[in-house]
């Protein structure tokens, strides 16, 4: 597998709809000229933004977190330009961008250093071959203080790995009817 460059990312987004909406360059300021956490195409990746849709984890129901029987009541829904994550807690969000991953590509998501240096960790599982949808993002606040996440700004970087032509997967995410195929909002655990 080889990592793909900005040239390849632009081609796949603009000619094949791999990322929508798509920003071919790096955006570092908003419309009023204020500096923001950058998003868009980088040298070997794509920096995604999160939408204004957040689910903030709370333990008001004193529940046990169980991925097989997840209690939706464990989250507070928030729609805002800023999400404040409680200390030592987490929040879910989704990307603004919708992805359509080709059969010969695997995408790895890494957090942006701006957030990592503040103790905010981004966790996303790989975007598998032929998966499509908005990416559900998990932000962990590892600090003992509240932490902010900004909507419509960069939050994570996607790295695109392309398989050699003779080594394309036999079974894609679409082939096996993956449970998160086509997700459009912040998606909670499914079994």
Curated annotation (Swiss-Prot):
Hydrolase as a keyword of this entry, yes or no, is: yes
Its Enzyme Commission number(s) read: 3.5.4.13
Q: Which family does it belong to?
A: Belongs to the dCTP deaminase family.
GO terms under biological process: dUMP biosynthetic process; dUTP biosynthetic process; nucleobase-containing small molecule interconversion
InterPro entries listed in its UniProt record: dCTP_deaminase, dUTPase-like_sf, dUTPase_trimeric
User: What pathway does the annotation place this protein in?
Assistant: Pyrimidine metabolism; dUMP biosynthesis; dUMP from dCTP (dUTP route): step 1/2
Supply the HAMAP family for this chain.
dCTP_deaminase (MF_00146)
Give, as one word, the top-level EC class. hydrolase
Key words of the record: Hydrolase, Nucleotide metabolism, Nucleotide-binding
The name on file for this protein is dCTP deaminase
Keyword Ribonucleoprotein belongs to the record: no
Known catalysed reaction(s)?
A: dCTP + H2O + H(+) = dUTP + NH4(+)
Residues binding dCTP: 112-117, 136-138, 157, 173, 183
Its source organism is Xylella fastidiosa (strain 9a5c)
Q: What does this protein do?
A: Catalyzes the deamination of dCTP to dUTP.
Extract the GO molecular function terms from the UniProt entry: dCTP deaminase activity; nucleotide binding
Q: Give the quaternary structure.
A: Homotrimer.
């Amino acid at each position: 597998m080889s990592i793909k460059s900005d040239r390849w990312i632009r081609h796949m987004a603009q000619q094949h709809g791999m990322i929508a909406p798509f920003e071919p360059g790096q955006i570092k300021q908003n419309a009023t000229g204020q500096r923001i956490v950058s998003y868009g195409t980088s040298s070997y990746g794509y920096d995604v933004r999160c939408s204004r849709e957040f689910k903030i984890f709370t333990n008001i129901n004193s529940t046990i977190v169980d991925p097989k029987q997840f209690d939706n009541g464990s989250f507070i829904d928030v729609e805002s330009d800023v999400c404040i994550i409680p200390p030592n807690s987490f929040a879910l969000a989704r990307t603004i961008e919708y992805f359509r991953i080709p059969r010969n590509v695997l995408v790895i998501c890494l957090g942006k250093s701006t957030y990592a240096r503040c103790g905010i960790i981004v966790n996303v599982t790989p975007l598998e071959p032929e998966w499509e949808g908005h990416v559900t993002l998990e932000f962990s606040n590892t600090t003992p203080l509240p932490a902010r996440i900004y909507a419509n700004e960069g939050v994570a970087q996607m790295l695109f790995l392309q398989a050699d032509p003779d080594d394309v997967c036999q079974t894609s995410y679409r082939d096996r009817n993956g449970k998160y195929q086509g997700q459009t909002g912040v998606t909670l655990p499914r079994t």
